């Protein structure tokens, strides 16, 4: 389960930002996760519950915002919505769709406390 290593990476980012800003507590963590990022959101939530314990973010609210998947269809030369990496283009039915959005995962916002 790679979600555990993702959660550990998030903890590292959160701790670094808190330290850089002199914060002793993080009240809220907002993540953006693309629908095409190959992340099981519920598994990540579970892992975050585990790795954030005894850290500056222990007890912090974790909000996850989904970023819809999109891709560039080479056949009809347009950006189209896609739910999975290998979906057909919803306009022309072609399979030459290059993902352009929804592949990202990032820490979008942190609410720091004293």
From Swiss-Prot:
Provide the GO biological process annotations.
protein maturation; protein modification process
Chain sites annotated for binding Zn(2+): 73, 76, 89, 92
Could you list this entry's UniProt keywords, alphabetically sorted. Answer: Metal-binding, Nickel, Zinc
What is a single Pfam family found in this protein's UniProt entry? HypA
Q: Which residues bind Ni(2+)?
A: 2
- Gene Ontology terms, MF aspect: nickel cation binding; zinc ion binding
Does Zinc appear among the keywords? yes
- Superkingdom of origin organism: Bacteria
Role, per record: Involved in the maturation of [NiFe] hydrogenases. Required for nickel insertion into the metal center of the hydrogenase.
Name the PANTHER family on file: HYDROGENASE MATURATION FACTOR HYPA
| The family this protein is said to belong to | Belongs to the HypA/HybF family.
What is the name of the protein in this document?
Hydrogenase maturation factor HypA
Can you name the source organism? Azoarcus sp. (strain BH72)
